[in-house]
Protein backbone atom coordinates (compact mmCIF):
# COMPACT_ATOMS: atom_id res chain seq x y z
CA UNK A 1 0.00 0.00 0.00
CA UNK A 2 1.37 3.42 -0.95
CA UNK A 3 2.15 5.57 2.05
CA UNK A 4 0.09 8.73 2.45
CA UNK A 5 1.53 11.35 4.77
CA UNK A 6 -0.71 12.88 7.42
CA UNK A 7 -0.26 16.67 7.59
CA UNK A 8 -1.37 18.61 10.66
CA UNK A 9 -1.21 22.41 10.83
CA UNK A 10 -1.06 24.09 14.22
CA UNK A 11 -0.97 27.70 15.36
CA UNK A 12 1.81 29.02 17.59
CA UNK A 13 -0.58 29.64 20.51
CA UNK A 14 -1.90 26.09 20.30
CA UNK A 15 1.63 24.67 20.28
CA UNK A 16 3.16 26.90 22.97
CA UNK A 17 1.96 28.92 25.93
CA UNK A 18 2.02 32.48 24.62
CA UNK A 19 -0.37 33.92 27.20
CA UNK A 20 2.12 36.53 28.46
CA UNK A 21 2.92 37.96 25.03
CA UNK A 22 -0.72 37.78 23.94
CA UNK A 23 -1.75 39.76 27.02
CA UNK A 24 0.74 42.45 26.02
CA UNK A 25 -0.69 42.47 22.50
CA UNK A 26 -4.21 42.86 23.87
CA UNK A 27 -3.35 45.60 26.37
CA UNK A 28 -0.49 47.51 24.70
CA UNK A 29 -0.78 46.80 20.98
CA UNK A 30 1.24 45.24 18.18
CA UNK A 31 4.43 47.29 18.57
CA UNK A 32 4.77 46.42 22.26
CA UNK A 33 4.09 42.76 21.44
CA UNK A 34 6.82 42.74 18.78
CA UNK A 35 9.34 44.33 21.14
CA UNK A 36 8.49 41.80 23.85
CA UNK A 37 8.90 38.81 21.54
CA UNK A 38 12.24 40.02 20.20
CA UNK A 39 13.56 40.90 23.68
CA UNK A 40 12.60 37.41 24.91
CA UNK A 41 13.37 35.39 21.78
CA UNK A 42 16.07 33.36 23.56
CA UNK A 43 13.66 32.37 26.33
CA UNK A 44 12.13 28.97 25.66
CA UNK A 45 8.34 28.87 25.63
CA UNK A 46 6.40 26.47 27.82
CA UNK A 47 4.28 23.82 26.08
CA UNK A 48 0.73 24.72 25.09
CA UNK A 49 -2.33 22.50 25.04
CA UNK A 50 -1.47 21.03 21.64
CA UNK A 51 2.18 20.32 22.43
CA UNK A 52 1.86 16.75 23.68
CA UNK A 53 -0.35 15.82 20.73
CA UNK A 54 2.27 17.16 18.31
CA UNK A 55 5.08 15.33 20.07
CA UNK A 56 3.17 12.03 19.95
CA UNK A 57 2.24 12.56 16.31
CA UNK A 58 5.84 13.18 15.32
CA UNK A 59 7.09 10.22 17.38
CA UNK A 60 5.26 7.94 14.94
CA UNK A 61 7.98 8.79 12.41
CA UNK A 62 10.65 7.08 14.54
CA UNK A 63 9.84 3.74 12.91
CA UNK A 64 10.45 5.13 9.42
CA UNK A 65 12.52 8.36 9.53
CA UNK A 66 13.38 8.33 5.81
CA UNK A 67 9.71 8.26 4.77
CA UNK A 68 7.77 9.91 7.60
CA UNK A 69 4.13 9.12 8.26
CA UNK A 70 3.36 12.54 9.76
CA UNK A 71 4.30 16.14 9.12
CA UNK A 72 3.39 19.06 11.39
CA UNK A 73 3.49 22.58 9.96
CA UNK A 74 3.27 25.85 11.86
CA UNK A 75 0.80 28.52 10.75
CA UNK A 76 0.99 31.71 12.76
CA UNK A 77 -0.25 35.29 12.79
CA UNK A 78 3.19 36.29 14.05
CA UNK A 79 5.63 37.87 11.63
CA UNK A 80 8.79 35.99 10.69
CA UNK A 81 10.66 38.45 12.96
CA UNK A 82 8.59 37.76 16.07
CA UNK A 83 8.27 34.11 15.07
CA UNK A 84 11.97 33.52 15.65
CA UNK A 85 11.21 32.85 19.32
CA UNK A 86 8.75 30.15 18.28
CA UNK A 87 11.27 28.40 16.04
CA UNK A 88 13.89 28.65 18.79
CA UNK A 89 11.48 26.79 21.05
CA UNK A 90 10.70 24.22 18.34
CA UNK A 91 14.44 23.59 18.02
CA UNK A 92 14.86 23.34 21.80
CA UNK A 93 12.20 20.64 22.06
CA UNK A 94 13.53 18.90 18.91
CA UNK A 95 10.06 18.75 17.38
CA UNK A 96 11.22 18.44 13.78
CA UNK A 97 8.90 21.13 12.42
CA UNK A 98 10.56 22.70 9.38
CA UNK A 99 7.70 24.36 7.47
CA UNK A 100 5.80 27.45 8.54
CA UNK A 101 3.64 30.32 7.36
CA UNK A 102 3.89 33.63 9.25
CA UNK A 103 1.15 36.05 8.21
CA UNK A 104 1.80 39.20 10.31
CA UNK A 105 -1.67 39.49 11.78
CA UNK A 106 -3.69 38.09 8.87
CA UNK A 107 -5.67 34.88 9.16
CA UNK A 108 -3.48 31.98 8.00
CA UNK A 109 -6.39 29.70 7.07
CA UNK A 110 -5.81 30.06 3.31
CA UNK A 111 -2.50 28.21 3.68
CA UNK A 112 -4.15 25.07 5.09
CA UNK A 113 -5.02 23.91 1.58
CA UNK A 114 -1.60 24.85 0.18
CA UNK A 115 0.13 22.71 2.80
CA UNK A 116 -2.27 19.83 2.10
CA UNK A 117 -3.21 19.70 5.78
CA UNK A 118 -5.76 17.17 7.03
CA UNK A 119 -6.29 19.09 10.29
CA UNK A 120 -5.81 22.62 11.62
CA UNK A 121 -5.59 23.27 15.36
CA UNK A 122 -5.74 26.80 16.73
CA UNK A 123 -6.87 28.88 19.68
CA UNK A 124 -8.46 31.42 17.31
CA UNK A 125 -12.09 30.52 16.68
CA UNK A 126 -12.36 32.84 13.65
CA UNK A 127 -9.47 31.08 11.89
CA UNK A 128 -11.00 27.71 12.73
CA UNK A 129 -14.44 28.72 11.47
CA UNK A 130 -12.99 29.97 8.17
CA UNK A 131 -11.04 26.74 7.74
CA UNK A 132 -14.14 24.61 8.34
CA UNK A 133 -16.10 26.74 5.87
CA UNK A 134 -13.38 26.05 3.30
CA UNK A 135 -13.96 22.32 3.73
CA UNK A 136 -11.10 21.29 6.02
CA UNK A 137 -11.05 19.71 9.48
CA UNK A 138 -10.31 22.32 12.13
CA UNK A 139 -10.86 22.77 15.85
CA UNK A 140 -10.30 25.30 18.60
CA UNK A 141 -8.20 23.92 21.44
CA UNK A 142 -9.98 25.06 24.58
CA UNK A 143 -7.94 23.71 27.47
CA UNK A 144 -6.62 20.52 28.95
CA UNK A 145 -3.24 19.15 29.90
CA UNK A 146 -0.04 20.23 28.11
CA UNK A 147 1.56 16.94 29.21
CA UNK A 148 1.04 13.63 27.45
CA UNK A 149 -1.00 10.74 28.79
CA UNK A 150 0.96 7.85 30.25
CA UNK A 151 0.50 5.68 27.14
CA UNK A 152 3.08 5.92 24.37
CA UNK A 153 0.22 5.27 21.93
CA UNK A 154 -1.54 8.31 20.47
CA UNK A 155 -5.21 8.12 21.45
CA UNK A 156 -7.70 10.33 19.62
CA UNK A 157 -11.42 10.46 20.41
CA UNK A 158 -14.14 11.87 18.20
CA UNK A 159 -17.77 12.79 18.55
CA UNK A 160 -19.94 11.52 15.71
CA UNK A 161 -22.63 13.88 14.44
CA UNK A 162 -21.28 17.15 12.97
CA UNK A 163 -17.69 15.92 13.46
CA UNK A 164 -17.05 12.57 11.75
CA UNK A 165 -20.50 12.61 10.20
CA UNK A 166 -22.63 15.41 8.80
CA UNK A 167 -25.14 17.17 11.04
CA UNK A 168 -28.05 15.69 9.04
CA UNK A 169 -29.36 13.59 11.94
CA UNK A 170 -28.48 16.21 14.57
CA UNK A 171 -30.70 18.71 12.76
CA UNK A 172 -33.68 16.41 13.18
CA UNK A 173 -32.91 16.06 16.90
CA UNK A 174 -32.55 19.82 17.40
CA UNK A 175 -35.65 20.72 15.40
CA UNK A 176 -38.04 17.88 16.23
CA UNK A 177 -36.75 16.20 19.39
CA UNK A 178 -35.45 12.79 20.45
CA UNK A 179 -38.43 10.63 19.34
CA UNK A 180 -38.23 12.01 15.78
CA UNK A 181 -34.45 11.53 15.76
CA UNK A 182 -34.75 7.92 16.94
CA UNK A 183 -37.43 7.13 14.36
CA UNK A 184 -35.39 8.71 11.56
CA UNK A 185 -32.25 6.76 12.49
CA UNK A 186 -34.23 3.53 12.70
CA UNK A 187 -35.70 4.18 9.26
CA UNK A 188 -32.34 5.24 7.75
CA UNK A 189 -30.25 2.58 9.52
CA UNK A 190 -29.00 1.00 6.31
CA UNK A 191 -28.27 4.33 4.60
CA UNK A 192 -24.76 5.62 5.44
CA UNK A 193 -24.50 9.09 6.92
CA UNK A 194 -22.79 11.76 4.80
CA UNK A 195 -19.27 12.60 5.89
CA UNK A 196 -18.52 15.41 8.31
CA UNK A 197 -15.50 17.72 8.42
CA UNK A 198 -13.28 15.14 10.17
CA UNK A 199 -13.93 12.20 7.85
CA UNK A 200 -10.75 12.73 5.82
CA UNK A 201 -8.65 13.20 8.96
CA UNK A 202 -9.97 9.91 10.34
CA UNK A 203 -9.24 8.25 6.99
CA UNK A 204 -5.65 9.54 7.10
CA UNK A 205 -5.22 8.13 10.63
CA UNK A 206 -6.69 4.83 9.43
CA UNK A 207 -4.19 4.76 6.57
CA UNK A 208 -1.30 5.03 9.03
CA UNK A 209 -2.82 2.34 11.25
CA UNK A 210 -2.91 -0.01 8.26
CA UNK A 211 0.88 0.20 7.97
CA UNK A 212 1.20 -1.61 11.31
CA UNK A 213 -0.01 -4.84 12.84
CA UNK A 214 -3.06 -4.02 15.03
CA UNK A 215 -1.21 -4.82 18.27
CA UNK A 216 1.69 -2.55 17.25
CA UNK A 217 -0.28 0.44 15.97
CA UNK A 218 0.98 3.78 17.33
CA UNK A 219 -2.55 5.21 17.03
CA UNK A 220 -5.82 4.19 18.66
CA UNK A 221 -9.11 5.88 17.83
CA UNK A 222 -12.47 6.04 19.57
CA UNK A 223 -15.94 7.25 18.72
CA UNK A 224 -17.55 8.73 21.83
CA UNK A 225 -21.13 9.64 21.03
CA UNK A 226 -24.28 10.62 22.88
CA UNK A 227 -26.16 8.23 20.60
CA UNK A 228 -27.55 5.00 22.03
CA UNK A 229 -29.38 2.02 20.58
CA UNK A 230 -31.08 1.81 18.13
CA UNK A 231 -29.30 4.86 16.62
CA UNK A 232 -26.00 2.98 16.80
CA UNK A 233 -26.73 0.82 13.75
CA UNK A 234 -26.47 3.62 11.21
CA UNK A 235 -23.10 4.66 12.65
CA UNK A 236 -21.72 1.12 12.41
CA UNK A 237 -22.95 0.73 8.84
CA UNK A 238 -21.57 4.15 7.88
CA UNK A 239 -18.03 3.30 9.03
CA UNK A 240 -18.34 -0.06 7.29
CA UNK A 241 -19.37 1.66 4.05
CA UNK A 242 -16.39 4.01 4.34
CA UNK A 243 -14.09 1.03 4.95
CA UNK A 244 -12.62 2.85 7.94
CA UNK A 245 -11.70 1.09 11.16
CA UNK A 246 -12.39 2.79 14.45
CA UNK A 247 -10.91 0.94 17.40
CA UNK A 248 -13.44 1.71 20.11
CA UNK A 249 -17.04 2.91 19.92
CA UNK A 250 -18.84 4.21 23.01
CA UNK A 251 -22.60 4.72 22.63
CA UNK A 252 -23.43 6.62 25.81
CA UNK A 253 -27.11 7.48 25.28
CA UNK A 254 -26.68 10.89 26.86
CA UNK A 255 -24.23 10.10 29.67
CA UNK A 256 -21.48 12.69 30.35
CA UNK A 257 -18.44 11.86 28.24
CA UNK A 258 -15.59 12.94 30.52
CA UNK A 259 -15.17 9.79 32.61
CA UNK A 260 -15.23 7.61 29.49
CA UNK A 261 -12.61 9.76 27.77
CA UNK A 262 -10.41 9.42 30.84
CA UNK A 263 -10.90 5.65 30.81
CA UNK A 264 -9.93 5.57 27.13
CA UNK A 265 -6.85 7.69 27.89
CA UNK A 266 -7.60 10.27 25.20
CA UNK A 267 -4.81 12.65 24.23
CA UNK A 268 -7.40 14.87 22.54
CA UNK A 269 -11.17 14.84 22.04
CA UNK A 270 -13.04 16.57 19.21
CA UNK A 271 -16.69 17.58 19.72
CA UNK A 272 -19.05 20.14 18.24
CA UNK A 273 -20.69 20.92 21.60
CA UNK A 274 -18.83 22.90 24.25
CA UNK A 275 -20.60 21.14 27.12
CA UNK A 276 -19.05 17.85 26.02
CA UNK A 277 -15.67 19.58 25.69
CA UNK A 278 -16.11 20.89 29.25
CA UNK A 279 -16.85 17.36 30.44
CA UNK A 280 -13.51 16.31 28.94
CA UNK A 281 -11.46 19.16 30.40
CA UNK A 282 -12.97 18.45 33.82
CA UNK A 283 -11.04 15.17 33.57
CA UNK A 284 -7.83 16.92 32.41
CA UNK A 285 -8.39 15.71 28.85
CA UNK A 286 -7.38 18.15 26.11
CA UNK A 287 -10.55 19.14 24.28
CA UNK A 288 -10.95 20.76 20.88
CA UNK A 289 -14.22 22.39 19.89
CA UNK A 290 -15.45 21.97 16.31
CA UNK A 291 -17.68 25.02 15.63
CA UNK A 292 -19.65 23.28 12.91
CA UNK A 293 -23.22 22.20 12.31
CA UNK A 294 -26.67 23.06 13.56
CA UNK A 295 -25.80 23.20 17.26
CA UNK A 296 -23.29 25.99 16.66
CA UNK A 297 -25.64 27.83 14.32
CA UNK A 298 -28.18 27.75 17.13
CA UNK A 299 -25.59 29.09 19.58
CA UNK A 300 -24.70 31.96 17.25
CA UNK A 301 -28.33 33.09 17.13
CA UNK A 302 -28.83 33.17 20.91
Which residues does each PLM region occupy?
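Alpha-helical substrate-recognition element adjacent to the catalytic core
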Residues: 1-106, 150, 159-251
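Asp-based, Mg2+/Mn2+-dependent phosphohydrolase catalytic module
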Residues: 1-8, 125-156, 160-187, 199-200, ...
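Short beta-strand/turn micro-motifs composed of small residues
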Residues: 12, 76, 121-122, 225, ...
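Short amphipathic alpha-helical segments and helix-helix/interface helices
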Residues: 54, 87, 108-112, 128, ...
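Glycine-centered loop/turn motif at secondary-structure junctions
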Residues: 61, 94, 116, 135-137, ...
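Short alpha-helical
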Residues: 80-81, 106-107, 126, 229-230, ...
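Active-site phosphate-binding/coordination module
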Residues: 90-113, 118-125, 139, 243, ...
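Short, well-ordered coil↔helix boundary/capping segments
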Residues: 229, 251, 255, 264-267
Amino acid sequence: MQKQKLVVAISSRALFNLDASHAIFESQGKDAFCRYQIEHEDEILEPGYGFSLVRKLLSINASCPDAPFVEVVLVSQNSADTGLRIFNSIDHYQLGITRAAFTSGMSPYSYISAFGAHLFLSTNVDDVTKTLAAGFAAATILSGSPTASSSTQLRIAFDGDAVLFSDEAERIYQQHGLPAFAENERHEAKNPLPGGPFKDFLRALHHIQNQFEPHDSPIRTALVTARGAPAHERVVRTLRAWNIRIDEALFLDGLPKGAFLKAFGADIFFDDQKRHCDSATDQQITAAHVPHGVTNQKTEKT
